[in-house]
Amino acid sequence: MFLLTGYEYFLGFLLIAAAVPILALVTNLIVAPKGRTGERKLTYESGMEPIGGAWIQFNIRYYMFALVFVIFDVETVFLYPWAVAFNRLGLLAFIEALIFIAILVIALAYAWRKGALEWS
């Protein structure tokens, strides 16, 4: 019987993680239609005829809101496991989390002061 221990599991998962996307791409190349002509080149707008060009400029404020959202979304991803294991981590982890939150509050204050959160 073949037993995997230690790094063999990691190597197995790494090979599978590399093989699945490659297999998906190769399957797409084999199965997908080859040519795009006529109506297949048009963009899709809810079954309606496309109006105007596909390349339009968006206001930079959308980018700033998205950037601030991503920053605080990542904050939530890092703080959730800390909150779940709060009782077992102790005082040092609490102080580290406070420093992390303080850095993010400073970043929020900076964005607010620069006007990144105002829509005018």
From Swiss-Prot:
Which reaction is recorded as catalysed by this protein?
a plastoquinone + NADH + (n+1) H(+)(in) = a plastoquinol + NAD(+) + n H(+)(out); a plastoquinone + NADPH + (n+1) H(+)(in) = a plastoquinol + NADP(+) + n H(+)(out)
Q: GO CC terms on record?
A: NADH dehydrogenase complex; plasma membrane-derived thylakoid membrane
Q: Which InterPro entries match?
A: NAD(P)H_OxRDtase_bac/plastid (IPR023043), NADH_UbQ/plastoQ_OxRdtase_su3 (IPR000440), NDAH_ubi_oxred_su3_sf (IPR038430)
- Matching Pfam families, A to Z? Oxidored_q4
Q: EC number(s) for this protein? A: 7.1.1.-
Give the matching Gene3D superfamilies: NADH:ubiquinone/plastoquinone oxidoreductase, chain 3
Could you confirm whether the keyword Transferase appears in this record? no
- Mode of membrane association: Multi-pass membrane protein
Family of the protein in this entry: Belongs to the complex I subunit 3 family.
Q: What does this protein do?
A: NDH-1 shuttles electrons from an unknown electron donor, via FMN and iron-sulfur (Fe-S) centers, to quinones in the respiratory and/or the photosynthetic chain. The immediate electron acceptor for the enzyme in this species is believed to be plastoquinone. Couples the redox reaction to proton translocation, and thus conserves the redox energy in a proton gradient. Cyanobacterial NDH-1 also plays a role in inorganic carbon-concentration.
Task: Please describe the quaternary structure of this protein.
Answer: NDH-1 can be composed of about 15 different subunits; different subcomplexes with different compositions have been identified which probably have different functions.
Name of the featured protein: NAD(P)H-quinone oxidoreductase subunit 3
